Amino acid sequence: MTKSRKQKQKKQDFLRKKLKVGKPKEKARNATDTSFVSKTISIRNQHLDQNPHDLTKRLTLLKHHNINVRKETLTTFQKSIPSIIKSRLMTPLLTQSIPLICDESQQVRQGLIDLVDEIGSHDAEILKLHCNIFVLYINMAMTHIVTQIQADSTKFLSHLLKYCGDEVVRKSWVKLLNGVFGVLGWGQVGKNDSASIVQTKKRNAKYVTIHLNALYTLVEYGCQDERARSDGDTAETTEDSGTLRNPYLIPDYPQPFEHLKLFTRELKVQDATSSGVNATLLSLATQDIDTRKAVFIEQFLPIVRKKIEVIIKEGGECGKSANKLKTLLAKIFD
């Protein structure tokens, strides 16, 4: 009996039932009833955005794989700077956006430059607080394997010097000079010239002009005080540089004893001479103008004067920038 009943049930699955007039079609046994009405649907771990203007959730988009998303995110933050300049969002914003100095897209890098200009025009002190991170990634860009990233590195340096030049030259005077020499292809003291970029006439003159202008600004901030930059009076500068200032005055900048490195740990450089890095210069504190000028005269000035003479003879925009740099060097060191 049981076997015959199962056979009948199996046969019913393959039989087409006759529809009767006036009666609806029967529903399947596994049909789901969707006729219920609910006022709310609760989904775990999913919440509606209560504040559509909250920019903290956009920070992760700065690491998005799409170039347009990164660019649009930088533009959004740039437009929002006036309203968030005094908020706690600035620190994570700069921490997430500064690595874009080495971004593969030129549009993203230009968007970051515009963002830095917008922040600096509202409050330059914020850029000064993140000066170390800026210098770190600028140095990385100067030695980057991609030529375009390397060429744009001095753009970031020029814009950073415009808002916090004194902070930059005090902390990384020698490193930045070595980096600018590298992108110009001039070779540095203690290094092989073939290791740097070879300077040829085929190189884009536009980028050479940008590099020379960045070097001009770096030397201007590193070897001149604020009064000399504004007035252009060299006599007062040389007179004041030799006088002993009151050591008990409140310093003009934060962390005046940072160069002593009392609470920092540094990695030991093994065989620094063989690697081509002058460890003495890199560890030298360049807090004052006199020290920076002495380092520049001893290590960099002869090379700069030799190279700019060649560029001046070639003429063009590069020649103008080189002549401008030559005038500055004569004003400071002659």
Curated annotation (Swiss-Prot):
GO terms classed as biological process: maturation of LSU-rRNA from tricistronic rRNA transcript (SSU-rRNA, 5.8S rRNA, LSU-rRNA); pre-replicative complex assembly involved in nuclear cell cycle DNA replication; regulation of DNA-templated DNA replication initiation; ribosomal large subunit assembly; rRNA processing
Pfam families per the UniProt record, alphabetical: Ipi1_N
Subunit structure: Component of the RIX1 complex, composed of IPI1, RIX1/IPI2 and IPI3 in a 1:2:2 stoichiometry. The complex interacts (via RIX1) with MDN1 (via its hexameric AAA ATPase ring) and the pre-60S ribosome particles.
Gene that this polypeptide is encoded by: IPI1
Keywords tagged on the record: Nucleus, Ribosome biogenesis, rRNA processing
TM segment ranges: none
SUPFAM superfamilies in the cross-refs: ARM repeat (SSF48371)
Location in or out of the cell: Nucleus
Further remark: Present with 4420 molecules/cell in log phase SD medium.
Stated role: Component of the RIX1 complex required for processing of ITS2 sequences from 35S pre-rRNA.
Extent of the signal sequence: none
Primary location: nucleus
Region (Disordered): 1-32
InterPro entries per the UniProt record, alphabetical: ARM-like (IPR011989), ARM-type_fold (IPR016024), Ipi1_N (IPR024679)
GO cellular component term, pick one: nucleoplasm
GO molecular function annotation: chromatin binding
Protein name: Pre-rRNA-processing protein IPI1
Family membership noted in the UniProt record: Belongs to the IPI1/TEX10 family.
